[in-house]
Each structure stands twice: as C-alpha cells, then as structure tokens.
Amino acid sequence: MATIGMGDIKKGVRLELDGNPYKVTEFQHVKPGKGAAFVRVKIKNLKTGKVIEKTVHAGDKFEVPELEQKTMQYLYDDGEMLQFMDTTTFDQIGLTHEQVGKETFDFMIDGMEADILFHNGEAISVEIPQTVVLKIVETPPNFKGDSQGGKKPATLESGAVVQVPFHVLEGEMIKVDTVEGKYLEKAK
C-alpha cells in the first residue's frame, strides 16, 4: 500500500488513520522560528462525515486508503437514506445524510450523477462535480438603480441558497461552485 508524508498533504488528499479513510478538507503549513515545520490539517472521516483536526510532523507517514469509486445516479431522498443507482447494473444503494454531508446534499438534484466511494466493499461517501448548473427557483426582483455590484440571495432547485449578482433573475440557469457554495456565472 502506498504512503504519503507531510509534504504530500494538500486539500482533497485521502489518507488512512486508525483503519478509517479520511479526506483533507483544510491544511496550513507552519514554519515556526524554532523547531521543525509541521502541518495543521482538518480531515473528514469518509465513513462518518466527522471532521477532526490533526498536526502532522515531518516524519509522519500515512497509508493511502484503498477506495473504489463508481459513478452512480442520484434517485431520491426517502427521508432516512439517499438512494443511488448503478446505471450499468441497475443495483441500488442507500447512504445516510451524514455519509453524504449537508455541503454535498445542498447541491444535489434527482437524476444527477455522483461518484460513490467504497471502502472494503461498503459505500461510504459521495462526491459531486466541483461545478454544477442549477436553476434559480426564487430570488427577489431587481429594482432600478441596482447597479452597484451588490448581491442578493437566490434559492436553487436543489434547495441551496447562494448569493448572486442583482442582474441574475428567477428561472435562469447558473453555474455554482459546490465546494465553496458560491455563484460562478450564468450558464451558457
């Protein structure tokens, strides 16, 4: 199994800790005036969704978890589980809201393709594309003089609320960054 060290740590890197797969969500390289450099990281447990903070020192090594990734289609939310279907075998699996994570679920719509991560044959996590195109279902109307480059809230078809420029109208399709939860541009 491959290993990674302190210098390999960056956002999105996956590592194994105590037999559980984690994903780095934030990191900060620290070079103190005295002593060795280290990295402060926030890592998300891919099985439980829980985020912990850890300090990584120069000699620390982590194994890279053996994860299988399958592209599946999101079907629906039955209240307890989010249902996904393998489009080649038509097998269905369910993941809890905790496994998916609110930051991911906020940008999911029925029929969307998502990458499901499997660890030891068990579905553990969902990853959606970094940018998605969604329709605005509700946003306040524009008023004359709204040209100062301000922003207003817009509710998307997925239920997420993002800040959009005043010129963006209800019913328009926009491109959204799912990692930052931000408006990028009008969809072309």
From Swiss-Prot:
Pfam families: EFP (PF01132), EFP_N (PF08207), Elong-fact-P_C (PF09285)
SMART domains on file: EFP (SM01185), Elong-fact-P_C (SM00841)
Major localization class: cytoplasm
InterPro entries documented for this protein: Elong-fact-P_C (IPR015365), NA-bd_OB-fold (IPR012340), Rib_uL2_dom2 (IPR014722), Transl_elong_fac_P/YeiP (IPR020599), Transl_elong_KOW-like (IPR013185), Transl_elong_P/YeiP_cen (IPR001059), Transl_elong_P/YeiP_CS (IPR013852), Transl_elongation_fac_P (IPR011768)
Pathway the protein takes part in: Protein biosynthesis; polypeptide chain elongation
Keywords: Cytoplasm, Elongation factor, Protein biosynthesis
Gene Ontology biological process terms, A to Z: peptide biosynthetic process
GO terms for MF: translation elongation factor activity
Cellular localization per UniProt: Cytoplasm
GO CC terms in record: cytoplasm
Family matches, as PANTHER family: ELONGATION FACTOR P (PTHR30053), ELONGATION FACTOR P (EF-P) FAMILY PROTEIN (PTHR30053:SF12)
Role of this protein: Involved in peptide bond synthesis. Stimulates efficient translation and peptide-bond synthesis on native or reconstituted 70S ribosomes in vitro. Probably functions indirectly by altering the affinity of the ribosome for aminoacyl-tRNA, thus increasing their reactivity as acceptors for peptidyl transferase.
HAMAP family in UniProt: EF_P
NCBIfam families (alphabetical): efp (TIGR00038), PRK00529.1 (NF001810)
Protein name: Elongation factor P
